Amino acid sequence: MSNPLSPLLKPAAALYRTVVRMRNLGFEKKLFKTWKAPLPVVSIGNISAGGTGKTPLADWIINYCLSVGSEPALLSRGYGRTTKGVQLVSDGQRILLDSREAGDETSMLAARNPGIIVVVAEKRKEGVEFILKRFGTRMPSLIILDDAFQHRQIARDLDIVIINAAEPYCNARMLPEGRLREPLGNIRRAGLIVLNKITDRNAADAIACDLKKTGIPVVLAKTEAGELVPFGEDAGERNMNGIRAFAFAGIGSPEGFLGSLKEKGIQVEAHRFFRDHEPYSGDKLLPILLEAEKKGLSLVTTEKDYFRLLGEHELTATLSVLPCYYLKISTRFLEGEEILASMLNKVIFS
């Protein structure tokens, strides 16, 4: 889709491209140091800004590690959080921060995986050092860096990059004109590419063929819609097929959310989307609640938004007595799951 502000944003995008190129050159020429952690490190990241299905893939990787007897720790920046510096979200026994303090995606992964250590830190090296010091007697088997492809200060044993099959090349435009965080050619730093959110297999195969020219293994996956979960007990159980809904969310790729709802047989008659990680307030939700009530619509949002709303206790209490649901999602591999498993095994058992 063409950006009407593109002519105005081109100079800023050109400047950003130059800064990114110089920074990467600094790492390649060893002008900037890369720190090697004493634990294996797996990085999961994007070359574009948001909307690639990274969080459910991170959840899959965490569960795979646990299934083979490895105990990972998750280290994230914690986008959208109100706290600063290094913060312990979960010590593997209890969750210590709410979604406002930890960030919505981090809270979601901590809740899904209550037995793992979860830390947030803007400076990932400080986060790793905190884990090493705090959990010296209960050291994790490896560190999973969430959203860290551009964070080159820490060396990694496996660098996974996720690409949205619906928008694989982002019109080759850098931020802020487009969605690219760095030039497409930099994907060659990756050890594995996951082509995700596939809805058209033929189109995905063509994209994968192009990506494989880099010599990097490519895995094909889709973000699969799961069950609809009520916010509270009063919402009740019901057959969701054919439900008339007002969808709302603050995510990077709302089109994918609408597609998932359609897969579930939900009729979306109205929707409202906010910026990714945008905080909720009563002023933002009240018009949605009023319109949904007027039209007799159920409210449906994403699991990530559910965790963001949990930090707003009054809003959550209100939504819990309404027909309000969140959609769970997961990653399902279409091709190459064994490649990812083999690469993870090499990191875990080397």
Swiss-Prot record:
State the encoding gene. Answer: lpxK
* Positions bound to ATP: 48-55
Protein name listed in UniProt:
Tetraacyldisaccharide 4'-kinase
Top enzyme class of this protein?
transferase
Alphabetized GO MF terms = ATP binding; tetraacyldisaccharide 4'-kinase activity
Q: Which SUPFAM superfamilies match?
A: P-loop containing nucleoside triphosphate hydrolases
Offer one example of a GO biological process linked to this entry. lipid A biosynthetic process
| The keyword Lipid metabolism is annotated on this UniProt entry | yes
Name the Enzyme Commission number(s) assigned to this protein. Answer: 2.7.1.130
Catalytic reaction(s) noted: a lipid A disaccharide + ATP = a lipid IVA + ADP + H(+)
Instruction: Please describe what this protein does.
Output: Transfers the gamma-phosphate of ATP to the 4'-position of a tetraacyldisaccharide 1-phosphate intermediate (termed DS-1-P) to form tetraacyldisaccharide 1,4'-bis-phosphate (lipid IVA).
Q: Write out the pathway annotation from the protein's UniProt entry.
A: Glycolipid biosynthesis; lipid IV(A) biosynthesis; lipid IV(A) from (3R)-3-hydroxytetradecanoyl-[acyl-carrier-protein] and UDP-N-acetyl-alpha-D-glucosamine: step 6/6
